[in-house]
Amino acid sequence: MAEITAALVKELREKTDAGMMDCKKALQENNGDLEAAADWLRTKGLSKAAKKSDRAAAEGLVAGLVSADGKSGVLIELNAETDFVAKNEKFQDAARRIAATALVHEALETLHEAKTAEGEVVNDLVTGLIATIGENMRLRRSERLRVENGAVALYLHNVQGEGVARLGVLVALEGAGDQAVLKDVGRKIAMHVAGTPTPPLALNSSDLDPEAVAKEREIQTQTAMESGKPREIAEKMVEGRIRKWQEEVVLLKQPFVMNPDQTIEELIAETAKQAGGPVSVKGFVRFALGEGVEKKQDDFAAEVASMTSAS
């Protein structure tokens, strides 16, 4: 049997972030083979991962990347249980690697099974993180924007490391004019989407989710009816309020945060003159970390009781 040295144990710990005794046992079980021991730890971690799968993963990172030619951009959200993990170098590196892979594999379903540039399957990469870091994790979502002529701009807010943050926005501008102008304005619009008090729900009114429109109409109808106005006037009130709401949540109709006297639509018209050709917003993507994920509220008393009964 190969000698299990302290240096070998240390190397395996650095490679996997597993505990010292676990690393020693893994090396003993695999005759000192470092790679086999790492795989053994991962296999051991698989059973742990299953136990963690029901724990809410609402923290983590949003990773963003734009291709070298500036015509494609991607955002991914990699979740974990605590914000502490977001500062882990291995976690940040994994998020960046997944984002790079997502530039090629757009659909989330195919991304899970895709291989990174290093040859590791994305699902295996995430499972390995669960095993070594010890928290439930998941690749929650991924979205890519691409233009044939134009530029895709990226803005990351509350940055946690290179290419990773708590909020990310992509904006795609279509146009054959001055690309430097498109890139600059695209980034400014991305900053607008990140910072405006009312995050846009759609690019145009026609792109709004019919369910969201129906819900808003129901709310405004109820409010108008309770006002005691005649039905005809109430109906006009509803239509007026729906139009106002659409102006608030449609990107092109929103006042530009850097110049509230100008709408995004007017900014695009101005940009076309600067760029020397027609410009249009092809699309935008906004990922805010953990949005829509129900976070588990810890019951401290129950936790103490559980620890007491277990001791």
UniProtKB/Swiss-Prot annotation:
UniProt cross-references to Gene3D superfamilies, sorted A to Z: 1.10.286.20, DNA helicase RuvA subunit, C-terminal domain, Elongation factor Ts, dimerisation domain
Disulfide bonds: none
Pfam family, one: EF_TS
CDD domains found in the cross-reference section: UBA_EF-Ts
Database matches in InterPro entries: EF-Ts_dimer_sf (IPR036402), Transl_elong_EFTs/EF1B (IPR001816), Transl_elong_EFTs/EF1B_dimer (IPR014039), Transl_elong_Ts_CS (IPR018101), UBA-like_sf (IPR009060)
Region (Involved in Mg(2+) ion dislocation from EF-Tu): 82-85
Organism domain of life: Bacteria
Residue spans crossing the bilayer: none
GO cellular component, one term: cytoplasm
Main location per the UniProt record: cytoplasm
Protein localization: Cytoplasm
Record-level Gene Ontology MF annotations: translation elongation factor activity
Keywords: Cytoplasm, Elongation factor, Protein biosynthesis
Family designation: Belongs to the EF-Ts family.
HAMAP family named in the record: EF_Ts
Function: Associates with the EF-Tu.GDP complex and induces the exchange of GDP to GTP. It remains bound to the aminoacyl-tRNA.EF-Tu.GTP complex up to the GTP hydrolysis stage on the ribosome.
The protein, known as: Elongation factor Ts
Upper classification of the organism: Bacteria, Pseudomonadati, Pseudomonadota, Alphaproteobacteria, Caulobacterales
